[in-house]
């Protein structure tokens, strides 16, 4: 279950420096709701200008405005506002190997990865997901390759005090999980349930009302800061700078 917290932003910027610009609006979610009901190319083509003005362009501005806030959390992560090849995920689905041939995603999202692994979709990073009824911030690694997963598990075993500190940060670490202990690890280990994880992710939920507030960018930054214990541990596990 994702955390729902009252976030403070005072540690990030003085009040006079807090961005006041509203990035997202009810029109953002209205478009996504309508897209879910009309997920076909003809409808999207007819409404592409709405997508750009209510969804894509506000998100690109958000990414650009978030960059200095992200740098204040860690200079090792990047916010890239380019419309193609940057932080923003494409709205188009890859349907080549999917039974669901719906051409478009019904959510919009961006990733803020570690600069030394920005081309790796499973690299440690922050993430923002906007979807009607399911909006959240997240941090961690999602579906890492076998080598990365082994390095993270080894770090949990070799640095148990640091991992215990992550567990005490009040942010629940979640992900898909093996049904049995991973090969090569003690099935009686204190953190065996964590070692079974195939993803290492923590998250904070937001309502549509929160996302549409002018101060949402600060709330998102504060949620990222709250999730740093896990991300710092993962970066160290993979010998990435913080």
Model region roles, listed by residue range:
Residues 74-104, 108, 174-183:
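A short, surface-exposed loop/turn module that caps and links secondary-structure elements
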Residues 92-155:
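Aromatic- and glycine-enriched beta-alpha-beta binding-site module
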Residues 23-26, 61, 231-234:
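Polybasic/polar functional segments that serve as interface/processing modules
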Residues 3-4, 10:
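Intrinsically disordered, low-complexity segments enriched in serine/proline and basic residues
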Residues 130-186:
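Compact, glycine/acidic-enriched structural inserts
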């Amino acid at each position: 279950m994702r955390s729902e917290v009252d976030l403070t932003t005072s540690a990030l910027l003085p009040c006079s420096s807090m961005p006041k610009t509203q990035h997202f609006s009810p029109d953002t979610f209205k478009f996504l709701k309508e897209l879910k009901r009309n997920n076909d190319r003809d409808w999207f083509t007819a409404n592409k200008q709405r997508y750009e003005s209510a969804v894509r362009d506000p998100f690109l501005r958000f990414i650009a405005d978030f960059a200095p806030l992200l740098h204040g959390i860690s200079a090792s992560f990047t916010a890239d506002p380019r419309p193609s090849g940057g932080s923003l995920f494409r709205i188009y689905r890859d349907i080549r190997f999917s039974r669901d041939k719906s051409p478009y995603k019904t959510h919009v999202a961006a990733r803020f990865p570690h600069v030394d692994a920005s081309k790796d979709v499973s690299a440690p990073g922050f993430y923002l997901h906007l979807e009607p009824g399911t909006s959240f911030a997240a941090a961690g690694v999602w579906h890492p390759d076998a080598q990365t997963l082994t390095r993270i598990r080894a770090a949990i075993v070799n640095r148990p005090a640091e991992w215990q500190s992550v567990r005490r940060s009040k942010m629940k670490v979640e992900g898909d999980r093996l049904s049995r202990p991973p090969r090569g690890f003690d099935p009686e280990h204190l953190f065996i349930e964590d070692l079974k994880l195939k993803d290492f992710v923590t998250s904070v939920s937001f309502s549509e009302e929160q996302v549409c507030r002018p101060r949402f960018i600060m709330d998102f930054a504060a949620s990222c800061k709250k999730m740093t214990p896990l991300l710092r541990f993962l970066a160290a596990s993979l010998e990435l700078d913080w």
